[in-house]
Every structure is written in structure tokens, then in C-alpha cells.
A protein has these predicted regions:
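C-terminal "cap" of GNAT-fold acetyltransferases
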Residues: 62, 87-91, 125-139, 143-170
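Active-site acidic-Proline motif in GNAT/NAT acetyltransferases
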Residues: 99-101, 105, 133-134
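Acetyl-CoA-dependent GNAT
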Residues: 3, 7-13, 17-32, 38-101, ...
Length: 170
């Protein structure tokens, strides 16, 4: 079955929360103590934070669909990354996850292309991305879209501080 991409709506809150939690667990679940991970997921990926994000006119989320099932997503919104060059109106790619069973089929590039079309309408906007310092595949992927490293910051889950690179496409 071919995978489809569509924009998320408020009706997708629960499905978005479910895929956000599932993909974060699949990708990073072994990286944090269980209670700290659960607290983080509830604070950031449960239904209410998703509802708030979807209600924000500066945010946009795309869903990767296999029939009626969400198998991936990309979320963007107002930039919150800590960098002195960040400006009002800049956009941050906040989350970009696809279930492992659906990776390496070109679907990530399709999601990114849909996002980039939105990002640059009606005019080109600056893109910011935070990526883990050891996620070399993601760094190469974002470089193909014109992003380069401009800084670093700590991404915090519980008591764990992960070094993240700040990437920017001017």
C-alpha cells in the first residue's frame, strides 16, 4: 500500500499523541530511565500538548498515513532554539519521526518536501533544527536541505542532558 501525506487537524490529536509516543519510545526509549522518559512523554507528547500545538496558527504538522493508520509525522512551529541569530517569524522543525518499519522508503524526504513547500510560502523563512550530536544520518539528511551547524544546546529529559546541534537554513 502506498503511504499518503496530509496535514493534521484537531481531530487527529489522539492519533498524533499515539504516534509521537510510539516513535519516541522506539527511537530513544532505551536512552533514559523509565520514569523520567514517561514523565517527559506525558508532559510533551500526550494529547493536551498536541491539542495546544495544533491550535497554534504558527504550527503545522504533517502525518504519514498507511490507510487510516499514522506511521510517521513531522511537526513544525515557531522557533524556540536558543541562538542569538533567531528572529521572530523563524520556523523550527520540532519533531520528525517515522516508525522503523516504514523507514528507508523515501517517505522522510516526501514529508520534508511537503514541509519545505509550506515553509517557503509565501516567502522563504529561516529554518532551525535541533539534532542529537551523534545522529549522523539526520545531520546528513538536513544538510541536503541546506542546513548547517550554527550552535549547540542541552536537550533535557529528566536528569539526562543530551548535547544537541543547532542547524539552520537561512
Amino acid at each position: 500500500m502506498s503511504l499518503q501525506i496530509r496535514r493534521a487537524t484537531l481531530a487527529d490529536v489522539d492519533a498524533l499523541s499515539a504516534i509521537a509516543i510510539a516513535t519516541y519510545n522506539e527511537t530513544w526509549g532505551d536512552s533514559y530511565p523509565p520514569q523520567e522518559l514517561d514523565d517527559f512523554l506525558q508532559a510533551h507528547y500526550s494529547s493536551e500538548p498536541q491539542r495546544i500545538e495544533l491550535s497554534d496558527p504558527r504550527s503545522a504538522i504533517w502525518l504519514l498515513m498507511e490507510g487510516d493508520a499514522v506511521v510517521g509525522y513531522l511537526a513544525a512551529g515557531a522557533n524556540t532554539l536558543p541562538h542569538t541569530d533567531a528572529r521572530e517569524g523563524d520556523i523550527e522543525l520540532k519533531r520528525f519521526y517515522i516508525l522503523a518499519a516504514h523507514q528507508n522508503g523515501g517517505h522522510g524526504a516526501r514529508l520534508m518536501d511537503a514541509f519545505m513547500t509550506w515553509l517557503d510560502q509565501p516567502q522563504r523563512r529561516t529554518l532551525w533544527v535541533g539534532v542529537w550530536e551523534e545522529n549522523f544520518g539526520a545531520q546528513r539528511f538536513y544538510a541536503r536541505y541546506g542546513c548547517s551547524k550554527v550552535g549547540e544546546y542541552d536537550f533535557i529529559v529528566g536528569d539526562t542532558h543530551d548535547r544537541e546541534f543547532i542547524l539552520r537554513r537561512p
